[in-house]
Curated annotation (Swiss-Prot):
Organism: Thermus thermophilus (strain ATCC BAA-163 / DSM 7039 / HB27)
Subunit comment: The glycine cleavage system is composed of four proteins: P, T, L and H.
Primary gene name: gcvT
A GO BP annotation: glycine decarboxylation via glycine cleavage system
Family the UniProt entry places it in: Belongs to the GcvT family.
Protein's UniProt name: Aminomethyltransferase
Length: 349
């Protein structure tokens, strides 16, 4: 089991540790709901050092990324970032990623922890036709996420740059608590916030400085409930190797006007199901629970849980394209009425 550079700090702060993607990570410190609401109302800090980081460099870096990713990497100016996906040749999704342009011929790609080896092998195979260098920088990169409406105010007291000039999806160098870092105004919670890329030896002093300044340590439980309220996908749940992204709420990522791996297969597929948001009248939905309409199964929950803001069970679910509802979710043998909800479940910042 791998440990992040913050493992000892988590234990000192009383974290309950769990295995996630081969890493020992904090599930929670106090309570998931408490940590969730701290991020929605103030500011929380997450250790996301398990995420993978690849550096893409070379004169054909952009051409390679245009082929390997579904979004238009050509629109990225230096110092900007975008959400994207790695399509496979069948029109499915190898992974969903964040891509940062660090220089004219240098990019940083952040991938999901469980997919690091798979993604690297996939990209290395694609890179053979391009003058490009791929480096797995995951082991020498620690990553913190500072999220919440008070994130900017808290972080401003610890950095040497004016954060008020930075927009969503900006990426820039800075010193945080005296340590060199790369900051990005990005996140996975639906709140404003920053992600901090650091050398492993700088992670603990920066993390503790953020906590001392008032950021509440938050674990994987709150990270998942926050992204669920925000209607964000989790790879392996809403997105898989078999998912056509054009049949999801994230179809906007796919730029059909450019060439990319699997484009023809993706465009040729008819959508047989659609992803919906559901708010239950009672009970807590979980992955795999059946969605019913008129007593018949018409879909399945891909992510579910309790929404601390709505104080209800909420779910992301795939239902048959023609299914109209009203819907119910089968919770422990009981058909619980579930109202369709637009996504996100809560307003994004």
């Amino acid at each position: 089991m791998k440990k992040t550079p913050l493992y000892e700090a988590h234990l000192r702060l009383g974290a309950r540790m769990v295995d996630f993607a081969g890493y020992l990570l904090p599930l929670q410190y106090t309570s998931i709901v408490e940590e969730h609401l701290a991020v929605r109302r103030a500011v929380g800090v997450f250790d996301v050092s398990h995420m993978g980081e690849f550096l893409v460099r070379g004169e054909e870096a952009l051409a390679f990324l245009q082929w390997a990713t579904a979004n238009d990497a050509g629109k990225l100016k230096v110092g900007r970032a975008q959400y994207s996906m790695l399509p496979n040749e069948r029109g499915g999704v190898v992974d969903d990623i964040y891509l940062y342009r660090l220089g004219e011929e240098e990019y940083l790609m952040v991938v999901n922890a469980a997919n690091i080896a798979k993604d690297l092998a996939h990209l290395q195979a694609l890179a053979k036709g391009f003058r490009v260098e791929l480096e797995d920088a995951s082991e020498r990169t620690a990553l913190l996420a500072l999220q919440g409406p008070k994130a900017q105010a808290l972080l401003q007291g610890l950095v040497d740059v004016d954060l008020s000039t930075k927009r969503k999806n900006d990426v820039f160098p800075a010193r945080v608590a005296g340590r060199p870092a790369r900051l990005a105004r990005t996140g996975y919670t639906g709140e404003d916030g920053f992600e901090l890329f650091l050398a492993p030896e700088d992670a603990e002093p920066v993390f503790l400085a953020l906590v001392e300044a008032g950021a509440k340590p938050a674990g994987l439980g709150a990270r998942d409930s926050l992204r669920l309220e925000a209607g964000f996908p989790l790879y392996g749940h809403e997105l898989t190797e078999e998912t056509n992204p054009l049949c999801t709420p994230w179809a906007w990522v796919v730029k059909k006007e450019k060439a990319f791996l699997g484009k023809e297969a993706m465009l040729a597929q008819a959508c047989r199901e659609r992803l919906v948001g559901l708010v239950l009248e009672g009970g807590i939905p979980r992955e795999g629970y059946r969605v019913l309409s008129g007593g018949c199964p018409v879909g399945r929950v891909t992510s579910g849980g309790y929404s601390p803001l709505l104080q209800r069970g909420i779910a992301l679910a795939y239902v048959e394209e023609g299914a109209e509802g009203p819907f119910q979710v089968e919770v422990r043998g009981r058909a619980v009425p579930a109202a369709l909800s637009p996504l996100p479940f809560v307003p994004l910042k």
